[in-house]
Structures are given as C-alpha cells and as structure tokens.
C-alpha cells in the first residue's frame, strides 16, 4: 500500500509529488508521458484512475491536481470508492456538491491550495481563536519586477487570470451574501514591507461564504498600480469575450501567457477587522526553478495530505477552514511552510 497518489502531472502535481516522496511512498499518475518524464524521484504511472483502477486500492491518500473540467469526475470516482482525497483543483461549482457523496470512512478536502486553501485555513483560525465577526483577505501573486504595459505575470493559469476579472465576486456584507463586479471598484492597500498596491474584489471565498457566520468577509486580490486600469479597458472593449467564432479572449490569453516570469512574490494577509485587529501575514518569493505560487499551492495540499496520514480519525467533507479551527493542525501547516522558507508572522 502506497502512502500517497498524486493525480495530475502538471507543474503543481509534480511539486506535490516531489514533496510527498520525501514523506512516504508516492506515485504520480498522468496520461501524458512528457509530464511524467519531468520527474525523476517518484514512481510514475501513465494513465488515469479510470484506466488503472488498481491505483484505487493501492494508495492511502489521494491528491487531485487536475484542470477543473476533468477533476470533478475523478473526485467523484475516488469518493465513490471510499478514498481520502485532498483536492487542489478549481472548478466553478460550489464544492458542497460533493458533501453528500463522502462516505463515512473517507474524507474530502476541497480547494486546498494557496487562495482558496491556505487563506481559508487562516480565516478559520482567526474566526475560532478570536470570535471575529469581520475578516478581510488580501492576496496577490505578483512578478518581482513587473514589465510594462502588462504590469503582471501569469503564475497560475491564464484562463483563471481572465476569469478573475469577469466572474462576479461573492462577499459577505452586513451579514448577507452579495455579488460585486470585480473591476467595478478598486482599493489601495500597502502590505507590510512592500510598496503600495491596488486591489479588487475577487471570487475566492468559496466555502467560507457558507461556513463562517460573520458580518463582513471579503477577498481582495492585489496588483501593481496601473494593471487594473488596463484590464478594465480590455474588458470594456470586448477582449475578454468568447462569443464570436474568432475569439478575442483566445488572442488575449495568448498574449498574456508571454508574461510568465518564475521570479514572483506571493502576499497573503488575513486580518480580523474587529475593534482589536489580529493579522496573519505571509510573504514568499519564487526563484529560477519554481514560482512561489506553485510552491505555496502544492505544498499546502501536500502538507494537508500528510495530516490525513498523521490523523486517521479525520473524516467527512472538510473545507480547509475546518483545519484552521484546530490550532494544532493549523500550526503544523504553517510551521511546515516556514520550514520551506516561507515567511509567516502572526500579530
């Protein structure tokens, strides 16, 4: 019996597999031989859980790192088979669609990446520790040295980047869930130790909308000044549209994808905004070999997978913020990230 199986051999999946191979036995599963060949220290299987059903019975914990369009079917199959699943994939539907599908002897942790994921864990901690009723999440994955005119870089997915600018952002305001046009309003914010940035409401709260009974809750995604003005212009001009036979969006994605420097910086500030303020602040930098975004996304999922091995009693549908409500588990995750060189401060 292997300790871990990572489903999906993209750059996030490969990073997860590399981390978990140092924690126990691990196999990486992907139908693309080229993706598998980029990893040398991990057992590899070419295929899927559908074409290689023996994987289901030969691994303890599964980490799904697939594109959202195909992740759902894989997750459904794993849960139907009663497996423990950590899911870093992002899909449009509410993760609660799987709540009723989780057998009593299995576990499903959705949205377990950087943001959503680590941001949820921190928010769950602040909510439980300080009984806070107002939480703000400020998050950004930025190039260390922005290039004009884009003033940004694609550290995750170019499709996901554009989606952030067109998908209505859900937030909680005065106890009610509301939607906001992401580019309808911009904010100024200066992270500690960093230059002043601008931000916009983004739709990254996910399960937090349903699990935290607070008065105010929002996520603001950060950008260098000038970027959002450019994005608003492109959106209004129709460059994010996908309705025509010759898609303006596809052309825009191709242009944006040229800005992909690995030297990025990740910022995450999760703040209780009650009368007495409490903050968790994270800073991390990419290098020649790996983006910070890939490290934080992959390692958050991988560390969470190790928790399922360490705490076999964990069961059921478990949004990431539930881990944050347990101070011991939350500290374990943050300390493991600190061990990887991620700077995290709590005040």
Task: Give names to the regions the model predicted.
Residues 61-78, 92-94:
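Beta-loop-alpha module in the N-terminal Rossmann-like domain of NAD(P)-dependent dehydrogenases
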Residues 9-10:
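Glycine-rich Rossmann-fold phosphate-binding loop(s) that bind the pyrophosphate
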Residues 46-58:
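Short acidic low-complexity segments
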Residues 13-14, 71:
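N-terminal Rossmann-fold NAD(P) dinucleotide-binding loop
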Residues 24-40:
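NAD(P)-binding Rossmann-fold cofactor-contacting core
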Residues 5-6, 28, 64:
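Hydrophobic Val/Ile/Leu positions in short beta-strands of Rossmann-like dinucleotide-binding domains
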Residues 129-347:
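C-terminal catalytic/substrate-binding lobe primarily of soluble NAD(P)-dependent oxidoreductases
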Residues 88-110:
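Rossmann-fold NAD(P)-binding glycine/threonine-rich loop
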């Amino acid at each position: 019996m292997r300790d871990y199986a990572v489903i999906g051999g993209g750059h996030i999946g490969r990073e997860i597999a590399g981390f978990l191979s140092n924690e126990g036995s691990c196999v990486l599963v992907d139908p693309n031989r080229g993706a598998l060949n980029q990893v040398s220290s991990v057992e590899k299987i070419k295929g899927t859980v559908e074409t290689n059903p023996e994987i289901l019975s030969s691994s303890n914990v599964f980490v799904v790192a697939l594109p959202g369009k195909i992740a759902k079917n894989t997750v459904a199959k794993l849960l139907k088979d009663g497996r423990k699943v950590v899911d870093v994939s992002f899909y449009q539907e509410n993760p609660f669609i799987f709540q009723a599908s989780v057998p009593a002897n299995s576990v499903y942790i959705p949205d377990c990446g950087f943001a959503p994921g680590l941001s949820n864990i921190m928010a769950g901690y602040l909510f439980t520790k300080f009984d806070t009723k107002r939480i703000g999440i400020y998050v950004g994955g930025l190039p260390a040295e922005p290039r004009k005119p884009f003033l940004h870089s694609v550290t995750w997915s170019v499709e996901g980047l554009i989606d952030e600018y067109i998908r209505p952002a859900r937030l909680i305001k005065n106890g009610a869930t509301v939607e906001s046009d992401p580019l309808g309003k911009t904010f100024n914010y200066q992270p500690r130790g960093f230059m002043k940035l601008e931000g916009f409401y983004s739709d990254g709260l996910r399960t937090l909308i349903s699990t935290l009974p607070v008065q105010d809750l929002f996520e603001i995604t950060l950008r260098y000044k000038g970027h959002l003005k450019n994005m608003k212009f492109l959106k209004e001009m129709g460059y994010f549209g996908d309705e025509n036979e010759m898609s303006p969006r596809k052309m825009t994605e191709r242009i944006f994808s040229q800005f992909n420097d690995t030297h990025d910086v990740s910022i995450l500030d999760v703040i209780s905004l009650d009368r007495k303020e409490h903050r968790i602040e994270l800073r991390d930098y990419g290098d020649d070999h790996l983006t910070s975004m890939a490290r934080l996304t992959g390692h958050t999922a991988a560390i969470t997978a190790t928790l399922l091995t360490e705490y076999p009693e964990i069961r059921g549908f478990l949004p990431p913020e539930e881990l944050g409500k347990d101070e011991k588990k939350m500290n374990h995750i943050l300390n493991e990230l600190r061990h990887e060189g991620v700077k995290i401060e709590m005040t």
